[in-house]
Amino acid sequence: MEKNFKRTTVTSALPYANGPVHIGHLAGVYVPADIYVRYLRLKKEDVLFIGGSDEHGVPITIRAKKEGITPQDVVDRYHFLIKKSFEEFGISFDVYSRTSSKTHHELASDFFKKLYEKGEFIEKTSEQYYDEEAHQFLADRYITGECPHCHSEGAYGDQCEKCGTSLSPTDLINPKSAISGSKPVMKETKHWYLPLDKHETWLRQWILEEHKEWRPNVYGQCKSWLDMGLQPRAVSRDLDWGIPVPVEGAEGKVLYVWFDAPIGYISNTKELLPDSWETWWKDPETRLVHFIGKDNIVFHCIVFPAMLKAEGSYILPDNVPSNEFLNLEGDKISTSRNWAVWLHEYLEDFPGKQDVLRYVLTANAPETKDNDFTWKDFQARNNNELVAVYGNFVNRAMVLTQKYFEGKVPAAGELIDYDKETLKEFSDVKAEVEKLLNVFKFRDAQKEAMNLARIGNKYLADTEPWKLAKTDMERVGTILNISLQLVANLAIAFEPFLPFSSERLRQMLNMDSFDWAELGRNDLLPAGHQLNKPELLFEKIEDATIEAQVQKLLDTKKANEEANYKAKPIRANIEFDDFMKLDIRVGTVLECQKVPKADKLLQFKIDDGLETRTIVSGIAQHYKPEELVGKQVCFIANLAPRKLKGIVSEGMILSAENNDGSLAVVMPGREVKPGSEVK
């Protein structure tokens, strides 16, 4: 049954203040949330958009220790960087605060105390890893070791970043402390737990029966958790950074970040509206919508609702539109590996192109499955869609109006059937876009908005007003009137998606404001209305610009490979006599050329001190022939001849293979006589 609400509270997952925001965050959470909020505002609905930085937790303390600074220094640096980046990118929060604020500390403490006083927690003693050298308990991220699944080194106590498997600290092979490097021991510690099993019955009814409209990925993950049976979850941990547990006997313990962070939505609202914040969180006529990534589904659909229900006075979320993950050039985005497109760097590299990234991220939104961002696709969507379709139509309509009517909107004359069909097409767009936005299908909604521009381009191409200018100006006026009405509709339809471009278009059209209710109308611009000078809405992005971004990623990949380089294991021992069978010599390269129809092969003529011999080597992708002429190389002289591409090769040139697959020919450190033995 359709529920009617007076207002909507929209939250977006609090970004972790231990690094900048990247495109995965934008595609998964912030762009869709901003589209939805802008849409509601255009409809004149009462909406509040809440954001803020999550400033507690282990990764922040780890970074602080690595850099030799305080956790507060870390969060101060990244909170302001993230906030500034969001502002420049057009994420239109009503408030963007932080969980280190006094308001948040007070509200989170009060929330915990109320649940504690109501008997909603249980106390449990458990064993946890302890660093005897550092004299502290180790949280998940303070423990590293070998992953039991893929056997890569450096897996964390909660997850292996190599294979993505969720782990427990005790799963790791050869665990060690990230603080001291020593082997940790198990030690008893006491913590408070939220007994989720106590809430399982009502959660099952509330989610599985009352919210079947949730996205399949959200509904499915919740059902999986519920079917496995919910377990008590710790709400405190041993750490010196965070909100102290506000009860006696809790010295050295803070609220677990998963408990503290979602309360940040409420405290940020209170900071903005100290006198009316409860209306947005406790009134049943308020709709609560959480925008999150899939790694936060359990916290926002099961844990946080259980907290709110246990407290007793808060509303529960009505919808939790969670996205899957966005990958980058076929690889998982990773902060620790620097494999990301960072928002603040994008804003520097592409000034004035916020909407291009918004458009591409929405077009590739991982709404139902993981999706991939590539720089080539970014360029193609800009050049082939924003420039060639949307921008081209707007520019043609505006320029032709300037040329034939001095920039004034011409009156529409008698309409032919094709005019009426075109007007009918774009009048239907409002209902379709609205239907899609209401169910959080932002990718399809944007595609529908772009169809308006396609309609306009086709209409201008079919009617060819430039050919009628000498014979039928009334008809030209009608065509351009209809085209300009389409342009005005585009400005409204794209405002939630491309706010910067819509604002520029509004100024070009000399319109006062936008109203969603006007979308689909064919009289937005009255006859005689003066337009401003047309400008290009979008610019073509050249290959060199994209190649620079791709190279930046390749450099990152190379740096990661070098940092993680590990030599291959030494092979089994051989007898000395077996080694002595190899005759390794130094030869001087006399000639070198590519082997026809063979991408990898070079043909050498080598002076081996006794005669000239031919050797074929698979190093053509690593050296140009002229680089090796005159050089001395090491080769195996007594290898049985072998025919390659019709050429008899009389030996093997020795090369060292780097960790990136590149080859380096083995050469003597100083010149020796051709034929010298390598011993």
Swiss-Prot record:
A motif ('KMSKS' region) lies at residues 332-336. Keywords: Aminoacyl-tRNA synthetase, ATP-binding, Cytoplasm, Ligase, Metal-binding, Nucleotide-binding, Protein biosynthesis, RNA-binding, tRNA-binding, Zinc. GO terms for molecular function: ATP binding; metal ion binding; methionine-tRNA ligase activity; tRNA binding. The keyword Metal-binding applies. Its main location: cytoplasm. GO terms for biological process: methionyl-tRNA aminoacylation. Coiled coil: none annotated. It comes from the Bacteria. GO terms for cellular component: cytosol. Pfam families: Anticodon_3, tRNA-synt_1g, tRNA_bind. ATP binds at T335. Its cofactor is Zn(2+). A motif ('HIGH' region) lies at residues 15-25. It is an enzyme of class 6 (ligase). InterPro entries: aa-tRNA-synth_I_CS, Anticodon_Met, Met-tRNA-synth_bsu_C, Met-tRNA_ligase_1, Met-tRNA_synth, Methionyl/Leucyl_tRNA_Synth, MetRS_core, MetRS_Zn. Its EC number is 6.1.1.10. Zn(2+) binds at C147, C150, C160, C163. It catalyses: tRNA(Met) + L-methionine + ATP = L-methionyl-tRNA(Met) + AMP + diphosphate. Binds 1 zinc ion per subunit. Homodimer. Is required not only for elongation of protein synthesis but also for the initiation of all mRNA translation through initiator tRNA(fMet) aminoacylation. Belongs to the class-I aminoacyl-tRNA synthetase family. MetG type 1 subfamily. NCBIfam families: metG, metG_C_term, PRK00133.1. This is Methionine--tRNA ligase. It comes from Bacteroides fragilis (strain ATCC 25285 / DSM 2151 / CCUG 4856 / JCM 11019 / LMG 10263 / NCTC 9343 / Onslow / VPI 2553 / EN-2). The lineage of its organism: Bacteria, Pseudomonadati, Bacteroidota, Bacteroidia, Bacteroidales.
